[in-house]
């Protein structure tokens, strides 16, 4: 799928159908996160794949069903206190979510409500912190990104218009 189409049509998904994500597809999603750049190329992040423990993790986010009802959730663990850690985690999460959508896999980033508990659950070590949880699964209903052009997706998005968002100086 064309890059602009993937970006324009990607929406956070909170309803998933049952079923696993094929291993080869999931590996490509993880590779998209791995290949993401990082501040000063420090690469101070790791990914913890939650399959069995995702039910426990679901109680530690703002919307439990986002994690509970998916086959897999990825915790992005970063170096605590690094000035780049949140930035790097966001970049990796977005790459994984876009790669997933390109494969027909939906995703949703999840805000953490109990940081200490999630750190313990995923085995974050001293000096590490879970920055974000991203859930992945097949969307409840089939969504064909190509049913609209990128221009149509952009025009129909419930987002602030570009002319109000951007200023030139």
Describe every region a protein language model picked out.
Residues 1-169:
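Acidic, surface-exposed loops and disordered segments
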């Amino acid at each position: 799928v064309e890059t602009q189409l993937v970006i324009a049509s990607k929406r956070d998904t909170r309803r998933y159908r049952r079923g696993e994500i094929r291993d080869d597809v999931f590996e490509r999603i993880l590779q998209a996160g791995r290949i993401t750049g990082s501040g000063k190329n420090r690469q101070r992040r790791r990914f913890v794949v939650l399959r069995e423990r995702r039910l426990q993790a679901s109680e530690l986010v703002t919307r439990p069903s986002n994690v509970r009802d998916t086959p897999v959730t990825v915790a992005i663990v970063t170096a605590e206190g690094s000035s780049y850690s949140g930035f790097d985690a966001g970049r990796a999460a977005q790459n994984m979510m876009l790669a997933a959508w390109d494969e027909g896999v939906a995703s949703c980033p999840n805000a953490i409500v109990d940081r200490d508990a999630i750190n313990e659950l995923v085995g974050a070590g001293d000096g590490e912190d879970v920055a974000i949880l991203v859930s992945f699964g097949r969307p409840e209903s089939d969504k064909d990104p190509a049913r609209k052009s990128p221009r149509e997706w952009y025009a129909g998005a419930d987002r602030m218009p570009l002319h109000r968002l951007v200023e030139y100086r």
